[in-house]
Amino acid sequence: MRRRITTSDSGEPVAVLSSEALAAKEARLRELLANYRSVIVAFSGGADSAYLAWAATGVLGQSALCITADSPSYPDRHRQLALTVAREAGLRHEIIQTSELERAEYRANPTNRCYYCKHELYTSLTTLASDRGFAVVADGSNADDRGDYRPGRQAAREFRVRSPLDEAGLTKAEIRELSRRAGLRTWDEPASACLSSRIPYHSEVTPEKLRSIERAEEVLRTLGFRVCRVRHHELTASGNGSPSTLARLEIAAEELPRALAPEIRSRIVGEILAVGYQHVTIDLQGYRMGSLNEGLRLDPI
């Protein structure tokens, strides 16, 4: 079987199935969606959930409702992207407020923090589905997620949330290819996660930290860096002083030379200090998905 080679979010080559095999997976997805009869799609605005929302709308029309969660944990740019995609794709779309920050377990930032976030989200979505007569709640998990540490999947199982992209065997690269063919602007949208993922485990999640992270990442995006993270660290103070904050910048390896150019580096440092950080450092290893998991023994969920 012939495969086309493309690149993943990390720049690594990945195989995409032949057109015939990919069409078979797409047909399987549509069959799954048709069997739902009605569905609420958890729609973050990212590549996976955007494609699922588009496909569900194509199969079920107004019986597909796409819901975007809004809270301090999510960057405003994600909400704006979701609104734009919904408008362009003709989705039936609503935004709801979630309150994961009101949960002490979430704020404590354990290694399974994502479980509490998804538990909050799926509580809201399943209640909404029950109240408004939708048969299924679905998320955008794909086949590549199976071997990863994703505590949110435990919550999905508990609430019987379906993952039709995964069930159809679609990988991230295949979803990007199908999204490109569908004309979705999200086809090459870099993978992302909630802002809390930038805070080391067991360091409290607060609205103030999340705002600082969002503002600092916006500095990098305004300067043209598409794949980037600002990791928020607190440095222990000597004596009785307050801890200081450090922004550790992860930028895609191929973009590091530009970030280190004197003029750009000066702008990065100045503008991120203006956000409120006391220290700014660029991680020479570059961007790594889930870098705060490094060194931890986490089994796939």
Which residues make up each language-model segment?
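A short, flexible beta-alpha/helix-coil linker loop
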Residues: 101, 200-202, 253-256
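Small/polar glycine-rich anion-binding or flexible loop at a beta-alpha turn
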Residues: 231-246, 283-289
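Conserved beta-strand segments that form the floor/walls of ligand-binding pockets within enzyme
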Residues: 42, 194, 250
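Short, low-order "capping/linker" segments at domain edges
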Residues: 290-301
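ATP-dependent adenylation/nucleotidyltransferase module used to activate substrates
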Residues: 2-181, 247, 261-277, 282, ...
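A short interface-forming secondary-structure element
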Residues: 242-244, 248-261
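Mid-to-C-terminal catalytic subdomains of enzymes
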Residues: 170, 174-220, 224-229, 238-243
